[in-house]
Swiss-Prot record:
GO terms for biological process: dUMP biosynthetic process; dUTP catabolic process. It comes from Chlorobium luteolum (strain DSM 273 / BCRC 81028 / 2530). SUPFAM superfamilies: dUTPase-like. Its EC number is 3.6.1.23. CDD domains: trimeric_dUTPase. It holds the Pfam family dUTPase. Substrate binds at R65, S66, G67, N78, T82, I83, D84, K92. This is Deoxyuridine 5'-triphosphate nucleotidohydrolase.
Amino acid sequence: MLKVKIVRLNKQAFLPVYATRHAAGMDVSACLEAPVVVAPGSAELIATGLAIELPEGYEAQLRPRSGLALRNLISLPNSPATIDADYRGEVKVILVNHGRDPFKVSHGDRIAQMVVARVEQVSFVEVDTLGDTERGEGGFGHTGMGQG
């Protein structure tokens, strides 16, 4: 198992945890002195009280929690949010409220998932043409909405 260094910037912060044995993402919790209300149609930056040190060649992705998305229309507008291996600041989560009702975030609420994944940097090779494929330049919606 990969070891990732983590610092509690606030002693009240909760460490990320896997909710189940085979979970891909760890639940990330809010670390707040007072509740934050995310008004309908707005976004708020939520502190976690944590900083991490990822190994070179890895990133952490912050993703919405499916239950918050389904029940409250709460998501992350920059999902997946990327935490680079060289970032050492506090992990914060942008929550956006797509719903009609204000959404209150309290200390300890699980607000996002964190997935740690390998990444590879690339170097681009500029060419005049690209190889042909069956798909070609077919873009958004090119396969239609029909049944499987």
